[in-house]
């Protein structure tokens, strides 16, 4: 499951992300953050942490440096 999620994120980064203008308010980007979270915590916890981060990525949030802890 972990490898499948990583593959999906990498496909998103390669094929979908270049079609959109950059809009992530954080560093590392939400997709990179998701990759790191899934690698570090596994499929379930990493996905939950990633969803929480993606929900924070909106115009009303200041953003900034937010590494996987």
UniProtKB/Swiss-Prot annotation:
Keywords: Cell membrane, Membrane
Domain of life where this protein originates: Bacteria
Disulphide connectivity of cysteines: none
Keyword Oxidoreductase attached: no
Membrane-related topology note: Peripheral membrane protein
Entry-linked InterPro entries: Membr_insert_effic_factor_YidD (IPR002696)
SMART domains given in the database record: Haemolytic
Entry's Gene Ontology cellular component terms: plasma membrane
Compartment(s): Cell membrane
Principal location class: membrane
Family stated for the protein in its record: Belongs to the UPF0161 family.
Function comment: Could be involved in insertion of integral membrane proteins into the membrane.
Name used for this protein in its record: Putative membrane protein insertion efficiency factor
Species whose genome carries this gene: Clostridium botulinum (strain Okra / Type B1)
